[in-house]
Amino acid sequence: VKAVVLVGGEGTRLRPLTETVPKPLLPLMNRPFLHRVLDHLGEHGVHEVVLSSSYLESTFRTFLLERHGDPTVTWITEAEPLGTGGAIVNALPHLDDTFLVLNGDILTDLDLSAMVAFHRDHGAAATISLARVDDARPYGLVATRDSRVLEFREKPAEPVPGDINAGTYVLDRESLAGWEPGRMISIEREIFPGLIESGAPVYGFLSDAYWMDLGTPEKYLQAHFDILEGKLLGLRYPSPYRDDTADVDLQAHLGRWVVLGEGVTVGPNAEVDDSVLHAGVTVGPGARVLGSVLGHDVVVGARATVTGSVLAEGARVDDDAEIADARVSAGRVAGRERLTERPL
């Protein structure tokens, strides 16, 4: 089995982190998230993966040069963004008659082997992974009967439970016949509805697997906390989790839900809680970092407070400054005046 991983999005809701690093390459437990996606595919016998993007392509090429082992990766350069469906159509020359599609920003422990078997057993043209949620307002609903998808419903106005598209697919090559390569296509809004309208067998694979879209800072943090809590099959880490090279002063305090990257320094009387700190971050003496994501090489000055914020690579917070609900771009310096910027 081969697979396509969709990595072309710009990750606008995760800015400013994604201004310099594409979302699939942001660290998850101190490794680029795409490693986890590829490892998951390899665990289920996938031997070749196709990636394509037009956004920050050089960063993906560096990642691929540094990655070793299965599955092997074929890279396709998109001259311009092609959308979720366009990227798949463009990859068809490299794929088998039946193949997997994963979103490069979704963390899951879904049993991919079972999903492929379900697809084949039902003679499906397309199979969509489904997750059951208590509140479908952010997603929209997928209506099924006996696992066959009947329609996609708009996001409900009121909080209602239901099944949603969880972003992993099994497709037959024939399901994409007639779609022209090289143009913008949405698999969710064009390809799937078109298949259903034509009467093609589209099925939903409902499971209780873990599922999280890493598209916002809040969900990015929550994914780390869920891993620390042991909610994902096969992923076990101590809590708090710190890289072996992290230097934490004996008088510093780390909360339970904390991840510290390579070379992080936390000074005396500093406090870090409910936060993820990427490689090279420095937290000065007496500083507090709460509910925040700090990108590579961020410096938080002595006695400064950072709460509910996202600081991009190389940002600095002056001594005694207070940062709340802020988005601080790469290399920017936040001064002693209280900085409050509502999230994007």
Protein language model annotation of sequence segments:
Residues 1-5, 13, 26-114, 144, ...:
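Conserved N-terminal catalytic core of the sugar/cofactor nucleotidyltransferase
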Residues 25, 141-144, 192, 204:
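A structural signal for short hydrophobic beta-strand segments in well-ordered beta-sheet cores
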Residues 46, 96, 123-124, 200:
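Short, high-confidence coil segments that cap the C-terminus of an alpha-helix
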Residues 50-53, 129-130, 293, 310:
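Short internal beta-strands
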Residues 99-100, 107, 113-120, 133-136, ...:
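Catalytic-core segments of class I nucleotidyltransferases/pyrophosphorylases
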Residues 122-132:
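A short, conserved acidic/glycine-rich loop-to-beta-strand motif
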Residues 183, 196-284, 288:
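Extended, small-residue-rich solenoid/repeat segments and analogous flexible loops
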Residues 276, 281-344:
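Glycine-rich hexapeptide-repeat left-handed beta-helix
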